[in-house]
Amino acid sequence: MSDNAQLTGLCDRFRGFYPVVIDVETAGFNAKTDALLEIAAITLKMDEQGWLTPDTTLHFHVDPFEGANLQPEALAFNGIDPHNPLRGAVSEYDALHAIYKMVRKGMKDSNCNRAIMVAHNATFDHSFMMAASERASLKRNPFHPFVTFDTAALSGLALGQTVLSKACITAGIDFDGNQAHSALYDTERTAELFCEIVNRWKRLGGWPLPMAESDSDSDSDSEE
């Protein structure tokens, strides 16, 4: 059995990165000026055979930061009333502090050295999380500052679909459009989708990678 056949740990699979699925709901498209209203995070785990599955979930409704823009079109789209006291919203600091604490524990348990965001159209979610972290003065942000795993791009490659709902359906994952644009629901579906893409690549023989030819073998071949 090759050494690569033993690469079934999460840290081995993603070069030391610890993938965490994130989705946000916001009051606009500008991460610097528009409010972050909801965020969900799901960590992932890998079993002894190298199969990836969702693990731990955190979900928060978030109070708009002071002076935040609330675009009416965005609120109409996601159906969030930022001023509804029944939301049980917390500050950006409290939400991200709890998520980062969960992520750092997962990194330690998995022997990973950096978290990497998994998201659908990840640039959007990444920009809002980073802006909120800066506003909250959170110094120990475990996420890579710019590298992400974007399931829109991965789904386009693996499934021929880039829209979350269509990619899920193509992958055999149930998707309820009535629950879409909830950060929790979209994170759950994105986590299932990412795991399916990673596991499908394994089922097709793409992982572990074939062992590279050793230097000694290369030298002996060149002498023949």
From Swiss-Prot:
Entry's Gene Ontology molecular function annotations: 3'-5' exonuclease activity; magnesium ion binding; nucleic acid binding; RNA exonuclease activity, producing 5'-phosphomonoesters
One Pfam family linked to the record: RNase_T
TM helices/strands, residue ranges: none
Entry cofactors: Mg(2+)
Residues of the active site: H181
Site (Important for substrate binding and specificity): F29, F77, F124, F146
Function summary: Trims short 3' overhangs of a variety of RNA species, leaving a one or two nucleotide 3' overhang. Responsible for the end-turnover of tRNA: specifically removes the terminal AMP residue from uncharged tRNA (tRNA-C-C-A). Also appears to be involved in tRNA biosynthesis.
Name this protein carries in UniProt: Ribonuclease T
Native organism taxonomy: Bacteria, Pseudomonadati, Pseudomonadota, Gammaproteobacteria, Enterobacterales
